[in-house]
């Protein structure tokens, strides 16, 4: 399994129609910020990208990136713990 970072322009999505929170609930995940999630999946970055893209406006930014250890970050304890537990080592 790999861990993917999904980050998108949360401000350009209608909160009532934001697909990302519903999509990530299908995976082991952690929310890192309003528009960023890490998910654990066997799916490819492009597959996840194409699942989300149709719901975003044309000018919204979307990135899906593979994550690995080591990493550096400043977040809540449960976010850091989740990343240390789930991220594979480089």
Segments (PLM) and residue ranges:
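Short glycine-/aliphatic-rich beta-strand segments at the starts of folded cytosolic domains
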Residues: 1-10
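Short, intrinsically disordered low-complexity segments
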Residues: 28-72
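Short, flexible N-terminal segments of the mature chain
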Residues: 14-36
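Alpha-helical structural elements
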Residues: 3, 22, 32, 58, ...
């Amino acid at each position: 399994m790999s861990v993917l970072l999904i980050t998108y322009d949360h401000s350009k999505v209608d909160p009532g129609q934001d697909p990302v929170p519903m999509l990530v609930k299908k995976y082991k995940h952690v929310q890192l910020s309003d528009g960023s999630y890490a998910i654990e999946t066997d799916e490819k970055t492009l597959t996840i990208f194409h699942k989300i893209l149709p719901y975003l406006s044309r000018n919204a930014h979307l990135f899906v990136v593979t994550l690995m250890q080591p990493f550096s970050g400043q977040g809540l304890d449960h976010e850091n713990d989740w990343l240390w537990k789930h991220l594979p080592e480089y």
